[in-house]
């Protein structure tokens, strides 16, 4: 899984940059960062990442769940939600998109490593 290509979709720039730094320090290749669903769809098409880390609350008119649903249907790329939302309705709605994982903010590096470091993503695509 190390050296995997990752797209970060996060509306909080500071969180996104911090996440990028931590992922790169762990050996992952962060392709890009975007803060909205439309850009996420375009960057997914252009860069074909191995994994997308997706916030639910995004800038623009499409949220992370709708974006993940479209990515799943069009590209079959695994998505891990990184979000502050942990209510039942949001989790239920997110689960329809068949996410690879769901991490509630605030999170630690080890939370991401547990999901990404098990090697299952290699056989997912």
Language model features: what each stretch is:
Residues 1-5, 110-125:
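Non-catalytic signal-transmission and effector/linker regions of two-component phosphorelay proteins
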Residues 10:
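Conserved acidic carboxylate
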Residues 13-32:
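Two-component/phosphorelay signaling modules centered on CheY-like receiver
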Residues 20, 33-51:
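Acidic, metal-coordinating helix/loop segments flanking the phosphotransfer/catalytic sites
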Residues 36, 62-66:
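Acidic catalytic/metal-coordinating carboxylates
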Residues 55-56, 83:
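Active-site residues of response regulator receiver
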Residues 66, 73, 86-104, 110, ...:
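Alpha4 helix (beta4-alpha4-beta5 surface) of REC/receiver domains from two-component response regulators
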Residues 76-86:
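A short, hydrophobic beta-strand element within the central beta-sheet of small alpha/beta folds
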């Amino acid at each position: 899984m190390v050296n995997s290509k990752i797209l970060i979709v996060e509306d909080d720039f500071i969180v996104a940059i911090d996440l990028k730094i931590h992922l790169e320090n762990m050996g992952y290749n962060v392709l890009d960062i975007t803060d909205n669903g439309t850009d996420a769809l375009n960057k997914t098409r252009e860069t074909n990442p191995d994994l997308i880390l997706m916030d639910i609350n995004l800038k623009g008119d499409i949220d992370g769940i709708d974006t993940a649903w479209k990515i799943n249907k069009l590209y079959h790329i695994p998505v891990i939600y990184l979000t502050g939302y942990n209510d039942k309705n949001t989790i239920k709605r997110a689960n329809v998109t068949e996410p690879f994982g769901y991490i509630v903010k605030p999170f630690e590096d080890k939370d991401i490593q547990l999901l990404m470091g098990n090697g299952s993503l290699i056989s997912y695509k």
